[in-house]
């Protein structure tokens, strides 16, 4: 008997039985080869099927050749794509998992490939990031596109696929754009009223049914609420879902938000679990077909509670399945603590729009999670118990080496413990616990309160291959240390020093912004005891390395809390009581501050180790993100 009976109960979708309620939603991978299914893509989805997922909805699959969504996404606009799709379907089906293709026309969201004609849209209204205005699609073009959707679905069916998803959520792509009043300003039969805006979607559904028959699954993805003034509301979408049911849709996939309001469709760290479940719950009351919800369902118990409490019938679990391909199997077997924790950082998709492959902060091997045994077994010493050190120790031990990890402090985690302190970063604590648990499980010898000395290297560890993960130290600016009360962000987050009430944070990267957020009052209510915080950033961009949703959410919080943000602000001098900066050629002086916090980056703390075989990993080699540290350590250890 598993601990999640509702989650692992089979469900009927149309005329198809799905083995459990864990569905995987579409997540772009950029693994396709000019639209064709590549072997890596087959392996990627097959791994999630092997991991126990009941049904997979693939990333977007374009239905016509003119407009490309992402260079590495799939297409199925002619029969040449069918053989690759058959390999993909067969790879997933061998594990009893069902697979749907998310059919998509990018329209005004197309990638700017050279030679692409003017983009089409419902109206001459494009997204905020568009380089030029789109043109309204003609009725003749819409009729052609409707037929292209039907033909594309039929190719999926020929390849053995179980169905298709029609993407109408997030004001995303042609169909999502037609449905939302934010983009659809038409006055013909495809606009005006909600029925008019829904017409194109209903015609696409009818086209798919015409080509594929009644046994083929059709699901439609919608935003239960766009959370935007003038956008689609929950009441609108209840009506829409009733019409979708009448049109023969087999289930509804309820997301939320849109592409206009950043962070609304893909929730950032710190967001409450299942933020769209209130919409799916209400929609479920008005239709007689299954309803799925999605977003931040990162633990099995959350999914179980959602289904048990009739918030939804199925849970779309995306990023956690990316983070751990065995998510479903581990949940079923009761090995919940062994699930690699998704922290919701969004870095999996950060590079997608630049054409990079999908990746994960916590899982350095998204495509292939296997660790091959070493041909020659060695003795390995890992110096430093931060995330890079723990990853290296785990991988080396997993490969069959004898591993000792020495950490000079009394606990493992390193810089990750400080990173977990700011608001919305608490899920990093799960990563620390997970990494420690793996070391225990593999039997890595961990020595705390142990600083490795030259004598130890010359004697006890003389035959060991050395992996040094000594981390980094926060940078300071010596001329500015004349200020009456200065400290680093690390000093604040570790509790070593306590700031005053009128604070200047120097540096608008992730650490500076998170520290300002941590220190600011929860609400800007002008309470006399509230801290006053000024953040100075010398460039025109906050948190350049942060994921879009996380960056948007944190920036909004800083503004709501009344943090004064000055971009393009170059600090030129500091004395005991005054901080002087220049912005747009004008000099400004801050005289009322009582604390100056340095958040200006980190410098590698490279400890030179005198030994034959030494590998430097993580921040001590090159300061970077958590993802950089774990990935670097993983790759080094795989080659020892």
Describe each region flagged by the PLM:
Residues 402-445, 516-571:
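Rossmann-like dinucleotide-binding cores of NAD(P)H-dependent redox enzymes
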Residues 287, 310-311, 442, 482, ...:
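Short, structured coil segments at secondary-structure junctions
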Residues 263-269, 290, 313, 416-424, ...:
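Short beta-alpha connecting loops at secondary-structure transitions
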Residues 1-383, 387, 391, 395-398, ...:
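Flavin-dependent oxidoreductase catalytic cores
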Residues 24, 252, 407, 466-467, ...:
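Hydrophobic beta-strand scaffold positions of dinucleotide-using enzymes
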Residues 2-11, 365-369, 446-451, 484-491, ...:
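Short gly/ser/thr-rich secondary-structure transition/capping motifs
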Residues 255, 294, 363, 449-451, ...:
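Conserved beta-strand termini and adjacent loop/short-helix elements that scaffold enzyme active sites
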Residues 301, 378-405, 448-459, 469-480, ...:
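Rossmann-like dinucleotide/flavin-binding elements
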């Amino acid at each position: 008997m598993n601990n999640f009976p509702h989650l692992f109960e089979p469900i009927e979708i149309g005329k198809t039985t799905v083995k459990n309620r864990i569905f995987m939603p579409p997540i772009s991978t950029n693994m396709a080869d000019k639209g064709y299914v590549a072997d890596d893509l087959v392996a990627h989805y097959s791994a999630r099927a092997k991991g126990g997922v009941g049904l997979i909805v693939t990333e977007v699959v374009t239905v016509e050749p003119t407009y490309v969504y992402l260079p590495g996404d799939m297409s199925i606009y002619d029969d040449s794509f069918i053989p690759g799709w058959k390999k993909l379907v067969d790879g997933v089906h061998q594990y009893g998992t069902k697979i749907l293709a998310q059919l998509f026309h990018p329209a005004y969201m197309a990638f700017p490939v050279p030679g692409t004609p003017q983009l089409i849209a419902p109206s001459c209204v494009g997204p905020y990031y568009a380089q030029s205005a789109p043109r309204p699609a003609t009725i003749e073009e819409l009729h052609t596109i409707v037929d292209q959707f039907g033909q594309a679905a039929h190719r999926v069916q020929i390849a053995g696929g179980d169905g298709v998803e029609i993407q109408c959520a997030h004001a995303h792509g042609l169909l999502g754009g037609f449905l939302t009043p934010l983009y659809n300003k038409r006055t013909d039969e495809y606009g005006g009223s909600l029925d008019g805006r829904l017409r194109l979607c209903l015609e696409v559904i009818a086209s798919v049914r015409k080509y594929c028959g009644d046994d083929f699954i059709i699901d439609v993805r919608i935003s239960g609420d766009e959370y935007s003034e003038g956008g689609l509301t929950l009441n609108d979408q209840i009506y829409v879902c009733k019409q979708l049911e009448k049109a023969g849709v087999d289930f509804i996939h309820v997301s939320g938000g849109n592409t206009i309001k950043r962070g609304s469709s893909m929730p950032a760290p710190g967001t409450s679990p299942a933020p769209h479940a209130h919409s799916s719950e209400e929609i479920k009351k008005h239709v007689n077909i299954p309803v799925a919800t999605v977003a931040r369902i990162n633990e099995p118990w959350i999914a179980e509670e959602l289904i048990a409490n009739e918030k939804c019938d199925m849970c779309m679990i995306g990023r956690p399945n990316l983070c751990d391909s065995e998510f479903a199997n581990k949940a079923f077997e009761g090995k919940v603590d062994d699930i690699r924790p998704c922290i919701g950082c969004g870095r999996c998709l950060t590079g997608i729009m630049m054409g990079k492959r999908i990746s994960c902060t916590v899982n350095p091997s998204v495509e292939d999670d296997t660790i091959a045994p070493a041909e020659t077994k060695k003795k390995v010493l890992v110096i430093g118990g931060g995330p890079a050190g723990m990853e290296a120790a785990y991988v080396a031990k997993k490969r069959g080496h004898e591993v000792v990890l020495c950490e000079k402090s009394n606990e493992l985690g390193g810089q990750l413990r400080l990173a977990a302190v700011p608001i919305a970063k608490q899920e990093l604590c799960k990563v620390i616990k997970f990494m420690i648990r793996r070391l225990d499980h593999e039997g890595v010898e961990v020595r705390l309160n142990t600083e490795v000395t030259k004598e130890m290297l010359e004697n006890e560890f003389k035959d060991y291959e050395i992996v040094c993960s000594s981390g980094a130290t926060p940078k300071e600016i010596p001329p500015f240390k004349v200020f009456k009360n200065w400290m680093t962000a690390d000093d604040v987050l570790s509790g070593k020093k306590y700031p005053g009430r009128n604070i200047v944070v120097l540096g608008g990267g992730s650490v500076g912004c998170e520290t300002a957020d941590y220190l600011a009052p929860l609400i800007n209510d002008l309470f006399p005891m509230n801290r006053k915080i000024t953040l100075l950033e010398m460039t025109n961009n906050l948190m350049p390395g942060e994921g879009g949703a996380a960056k948007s959410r944190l920036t909004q919080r800083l503004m709501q809390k009344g943090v004064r943000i000055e971009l393009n602000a170059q600090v030129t001098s500091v004395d005991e009581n005054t901080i002087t900066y220049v912005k747009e050629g004008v000099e400004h002086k801050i005289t009322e501050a009582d604390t100056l916090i340095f958040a200006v980056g980190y410098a590698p703390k490279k400890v030179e180790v005198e030994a034959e075989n030494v590998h430097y990993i993580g921040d001590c080699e090159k300061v970077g993100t958590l993802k950089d540290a774990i990935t670097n350590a993983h790759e080094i250890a795989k080659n020892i």
